[in-house]
């Protein structure tokens, strides 16, 4: 398996653009953590995050909201745009096992 950051950011981009968790399911460490700048509590398992993301994607499909994810070669984050106006980034951290250890959603200004 490719373990470059581009491999992982492309998988996350694919998941968000297709509103389908399958591109990232096998790439998350069991002890994966997810945090959001806008939410106080952190998720602490891959299972918890994937369940959350399934629900999030279902809500986005039902609402008809347009979400676009962008992969930027060589960067450790993706950019999300919702309804052509709300932009944020998801920064990924990969561990020594070659799995995604965490994802942090935050304002795009914090992504570099």
Residue ranges and their predicted role:
Residues 22-71:
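A solvent-exposed, acidic/Ser-Thr-rich amphipathic alpha-helical stretch
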Residues 1-22, 26, 30:
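Short, low-complexity N-terminal intrinsically disordered segments enriched in polar/charged residues
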Residues 15, 39-40, 91:
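Short N-terminal micro-motifs specific to bacterial/archaeal maturation
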Residues 50-112:
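A beta-strand edge to alpha-helix "cap/lid" segment located at domain peripheries
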Residues 1-2, 46, 99:
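Intrinsic-disorder-associated interaction segments
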Residues 1, 34-37, 102-105:
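Charged, low-complexity, helix/coiled-coil-prone segments
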């Amino acid at each position: 398996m490719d373990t470059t950051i581009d491999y992982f950011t492309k998988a996350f981009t694919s998941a968000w653009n297709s509103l389908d968790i399958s591109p990232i399911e096998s790439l998350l460490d069991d002890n994966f953590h997810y945090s959001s700048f806008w939410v106080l509590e952190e998720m602490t398992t891959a299972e918890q995050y994937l369940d959350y993301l399934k629900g999030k994607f279902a809500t986005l499909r039902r609402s008809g909201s347009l979400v676009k994810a962008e992969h930027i070669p060589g960067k450790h984050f993706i950019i999300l745009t919702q309804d052509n106006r709300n932009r944020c980034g998801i920064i990924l951290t990969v561990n020594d096992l070659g799995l995604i250890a965490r994802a942090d959603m935050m304002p795009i200004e914090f992504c570099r």
